Amino acid sequence: MLYSPRLTDQILIVAGEASADLHAARTLHELQRLRPGLTAFGVGGPRLREAGLEALAPAEDISVMGLAEVLPRIPRILGILRMLGRAAAERRPKAALLVDLPDFNLRLAARLKKLGIPVVYYVSPTIWAWRQGRAKQIARVVDRMLCILPFEERFYEGTGVSARFVGHPFAERPPPGTPESYRSALGLPAARTTIAMVPGSRPSELKRLLPPMLEAAERLRAAHPDAQFVVPVAPTLDRAALEPYLAAHRTLEVRLVDGRTEEVVGASDAALVKSGTSTLEAGLMLRPMVVVYKLSWLSYAVARMLVKIAHVALVNILAGRGIVPELLQRDASPERMAAEVERLLGDRAAREAQIAALREVRASLGEPGAPLRVAEEVLGVMR
């Protein structure tokens, strides 16, 4: 369905980390297709900017995770929050599309609500895991909550939040090919043992995860001299950010690939993947993996008190059980990482059981078409 263009069709979009940037960019493409002439301003990464977003601030300035990591950035984050509030008051966008990043976006939503600007929130905060009281705040400041996990719409029943499961954006992706086909596409030797390492899209994640991943790679190379290691560089990062870590492992063969996380994982015999959206992105490639994560001691202590779920990896949450190993904090050591990857490389039954469970997770994500459904929701609330 096409909507008639209007001279003043402008919306506000805010997306922080790499996955949100991708989801928002695809939605913006659909919005522009449905309503030619529509423009957008706000905060986003490279994909949103390529799609036409007028970026008032870079995504990395607001995409910070963990209490200790956020504290030194608070002045800059609050400055961007105030700047977006002023921009919204001056430009009066027809609607706002806020993607993930709840600590920032819910505060912005409250400001937008006072201005009478309809708010569509895409990618629900994980209130089913912690801080469930936020449902009341969401009901006050969000007009439509668009959920990407199948159980989230039911969670909001009776809370006053207008929620809809729109399907997961990753459901758009075709079934994965063979490891050999991805290695060929990436220019990697097809016959060599290939291990993917996905350290994340934030500098703080690189700092905590890439060094132990590289040390684990050294151990794995000792057992597999032919092994090659591949690291996708998130769109929100520059290759130069990885160089200091790689410099300590000059004899280790590490191939950097700009973006293309799914292809890197698809090319692997096994993968080390940081917890978060990356685990689902990797899981959809149906490759055996180990999930790792580290926070500052303060952030982890707070999380342990607040989080109410048994698993942290998204694929485990969706499966309702531990289908992939989770190595957190001290357990995310080079020794444990190497041992778990070695088990997946050598134990055929463990590999096949994990892949079978990942197939079930993939099937639970709903039908393709999430960007279109989100675009229609935004157009539906536009003033």
Curated annotation (Swiss-Prot):
It comes from the Bacteria. InterPro entries: Glyco_trans_19. One of its GO terms (molecular function) is phospholipid binding. It catalyses: a lipid X + a UDP-2-N,3-O-bis[(3R)-3-hydroxyacyl]-alpha-D-glucosamine = a lipid A disaccharide + UDP + H(+). It is an enzyme of class 2 (transferase). GO terms for cellular component: membrane. Pfam families: LpxB (PF02684). GO terms for biological process: lipid A biosynthetic process. Pathway: Bacterial outer membrane biogenesis; LPS lipid A biosynthesis. Keywords: Glycosyltransferase, Lipid A biosynthesis, Lipid biosynthesis, Lipid metabolism, Transferase. Its EC number is 2.4.1.182. Gene3D superfamilies: Glycogen Phosphorylase B (3.40.50.2000). Condensation of UDP-2,3-diacylglucosamine and 2,3-diacylglucosamine-1-phosphate to form lipid A disaccharide, a precursor of lipid A, a phosphorylated glycolipid that anchors the lipopolysaccharide to the outer membrane of the cell. PANTHER family: LIPID-A-DISACCHARIDE SYNTHASE (PTHR30372), LIPID-A-DISACCHARIDE SYNTHASE, MITOCHONDRIAL-RELATED (PTHR30372:SF4). HAMAP family: LpxB (MF_00392). Belongs to the LpxB family. NCBIfam families: lpxB. This is Lipid-A-disaccharide synthase. It comes from Anaeromyxobacter dehalogenans (strain 2CP-C).
